[in-house]
Design a protein with these regions (language model features):
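Extracytoplasmic catalytic/substrate-binding loops of multi-pass membrane glycan-assembly enzymes
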Residues: 26-41, 51-69, 76-79, 234-235, ...
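Membrane-lumen/periplasm interface segments of specific transmembrane helices
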Residues: 209-282, 382-385, 461-468
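Short periplasmic/luminal acceptor-recognition loop of GT-C membrane glycosyltransferases, typified by
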Residues: 58, 468-545, 555-576, 605-612
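Membrane-interface alpha helices of multi-pass inner-membrane proteins
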Residues: 165-181, 187-195, 216, 220, ...
Length: 637
């Protein structure tokens, strides 16, 4: 009965998921930036194109190949990706809830699940895509999900010592290699922690055999993809294909670009360090005051209510969408308190811990997963450098650290504040309902009030994030695309991008042949997908991929297979080192010169793109392409 009741904490997560789905239905994607590639590349692969040969991709091959298979089975539609992502998000929520329930309690696990739900469906910036339903990179999303599965398997391996969980963990790590480098590096950290923990109780030979098993299982997915690519190209190219996410880093890391300097805080490191200290100090004051006042035996009910109201009021009025600078410091505190829990729950003295091999039954299994999760949080947060935040890329990279902070505030910190009691051991300590009995502490009334105040503080913050997202979603009422490909984007009065993209797609479908080819510069592969027009060059996103492939290489691809039409779309390139695409050498200048010599304009909507910042789309046809019939220059509504 208790085991069934422990799952009741998932009900609030389900309610939040339904509410947030209704709030942002089909409003998660951006019509211009990034997400078009997430649709266009799998569509091309489902029609027989070869990844990294016919169409480029900055990231690994796993996600696009998975989506291409879905398109082949269920048909080409945004709905297919939405259904897949919803199922994966639900699986991720239940898995993380179950894992934290085992190492904490229902309140902590439920709050963590709610926080993940809010992040998964949020829009914290004016640009979409930074969510789990229509992500800017499915490789990031899938890699993190696989990392969580890997950690669940590693925790089971540490608990039971069986080979199957380890083999599955190795397979997950191999799949993560095919997503994004930062996720793979982040996943290696908990794997290393698991090996260190096992080293304390396994012989060198047994540990070597275990690692060999993990390595072999990790190579299986790589071998499978290598065989698939080998059927389309030679062995050297196939080997490069399975390393597709890593090869651009050999030419340039992109760290010199303004977007990455701002993301990592390298543009103003001392400012971000100061902000982290201020944020951490403010949180410490709030938590300290709650602990000081609410744990007193003489606390009056009215004072308790006032503290609860103050905690909620402070939180709901704080700018959570820009928060996260103090996450590294919170992770350090969480690691210290986890270490304390580990040592106090250990049945041997410190000296015996250092000298003796330990038997399986002497280990406190609920503490395994938090150790792995904290290692993953540290490693993934490292890419954000001095500027950790839960918005933008932080929706993915800071998510584990954000959940770790909740685990610290609702579980580790209250256990630290509790008074020691005689040790209580459960006959079945791995049951979720008994997880609270495994430590050395009991909960008193004052700490229940303290946890309630922290819970109110966190829930108010999640409400603030939801309200912030809803303000963006309220402005979105313009449909782009139709049927299963429909995206709801900003009203033209707020942002003309969606309306201009819809007009451009309609013009292309009306005035060009279905077999005509199209390239969008410097961004805009959504047009290719919506109109089902192929880009004959491998280049998908000229503006954001120049740093990886080089302008001359991309220009050579265009000259070799010139598209029938080119859509030039307004795009701010300042994040990549220039005010606009085509203004300077190395950032589209030669490409735009080539376009000017070989193409002539046939249609314009809005302002002249890449000139004065006003949004507009101009379509040009190749000089050898027959002139299309149709209107010459409609205006924006």
């Amino acid at each position: 009965m208790k085991k069934k009741l422990s799952w009741l904490g998932a009900i609030p997560m389900g309610i939040a998921l339904i509410l947030l789905t209704w709030l942002g239905w089909r409003k998660w994607a951006d019509p211009l930036i990034d997400f078009g590639q997430q649709l266009y590349v799998p569509w091309r692969l489902s029609r027989g194109a070869v990844l990294y040969h016919d169409v480029s991709c900055l990231y690994g091959c796993l996600s696009v190949c998975y989506h291409a298979v879905l398109f082949k089975i269920f048909g080409v539609s945004l709905n297919v990706l939405l259904a897949s992502n919803f199922l994966i998000v639900i699986f991720l929520l239940l898995l993380i809830y179950r894992l934290f329930l085992k190492c904490s309690d229902a309140w902590t696990a439920t709050t963590i699940g709610l926080a993940l739900t809010v992040l998964a469906f949020s829009q914290l910036l004016d640009v979409g895509n930074y969510n789990y339903i229509c992500p800017y990179s499915h490789e990031e999303f899938h890699g993190i999900v696989l990392a969580v599965v890997m950690m669940a398997c590693l925790a089971r391996w540490l608990e039971a010592g069986r080979k199957l969980p380890l083999a599955l963990a190795g397979g997950c790590l191999g799949l993560i290699f095919l997503t994004k480098p930062e996720v793979f590096v982040g996943a290696v950290a908990p794997f290393a922690v698991a090996v260190i923990l096992q080293w304390r109780r396994l012989s060198v030979l047994d540990l070597a055999k275990a690692l060999l098993l993990a390595v072999v299982c990790g190579l299986i997915p790589l071998a499978g993809f290598f065989a698939g690519f080998r059927s389309e190209m030679n062995s050297a190219d196939a080997a490069r294909a399975i390393c597709g996410a890593w090869l651009p880093l050999l030419h340039s890391t992109g760290l010199q670009l303004p977007i990455y300097r701002a993301m990592t805080g390298m543009d103003a490191p001392w400012h971000h360090i100061a902000q982290a200290l201020i944020e951490f100090s403010g949180l410490a004051v709030i938590v300290g005051l709650c602990a000081w006042r609410l744990t007193r035996p003489t606390l009056k009910p009215l004072e308790r209510v006032l503290i609860f109201a103050a905690a909620g009021g402070v939180s709901v009025n704080y700018g959570w969408q820009s928060a996260g600078h103090c996450l590294p410091l919170l992770l350090v505190v969480a690691a210290i308190l986890w270490r304390r829990e580990w040592r106090r729950s250990f049945q041997f003295s410190v000296s015996s811990f250092q000298t003796e091999h330990l038997k399986l039954e002497t280990w406190n299994s609920p503490l395994f997963f938090p150790a792995l999760w904290l290692a993953f949080s540290f490693a993934l947060l490292a890419k954000l450098g001095f500027n950790p935040h839960i918005s933008h890329y932080g929706v993915f990279l800071a998510m584990p650290a954000f959940l770790s902070a909740i685990y610290l505030l609702l579980h580790l910190l209250p256990r630290f504040l509790q008074s020691p009691r005689p040790e209580v051991h459960s006959p079945q300590p791995d049951r979720p309902s008994d997880a609270g009995q495994i430590g050395l502490w009991t909960v008193d009334c004052g700490l229940k009030s303290f946890r309630a105040a922290i819970l109110i503080f966190l829930l108010a913050g999640l409400a603030r994030l939801t309200i912030h997202s809803s303000l963006f979603y309220t402005d979105k009422d313009f449909p782009l695309g139709s049927g299963g490909d429909r995206i709801v984007t900003y009203d033209p009065k707020v942002d003309p991008t969606g309306a201009a993209m819809a007009s451009a797609a309609a013009w292309i479908e009306t005035n060009t042949a279905p077999t005509s080819t199209l390239a969008a510069l410097p961004q805009g592969s959504m047009l290719n997908y919506l109109t089902r027009r192929i880009n004959p060059t491998p280049c998908v996103a000229f503006g954001s991929e120049l740093w990886a492939y080089g302008e001359q290489n991309m220009l050579a691809d265009c000259a070799k297979n010139p598209p029938d039409y080119i859509a030039i779309i307004q795009w701010d390139g300042s994040e990549f080192g220039a005010p606009r695409f085509g203004l300077q050498k190395g950032f589209g200048y030669d490409v735009m010169q080539w376009v000017g010599k070989n193409y002539q304009p046939v249609w314009l909507i809005g302002g002249e793109p890449l000139q004065n910042g006003a949004f507009g789309i101009k379509i040009l046809k190749h000089l050898s392409t027959p002139v299309p019939a149709g209107p010459a220059k409609p205006a924006l509504p």
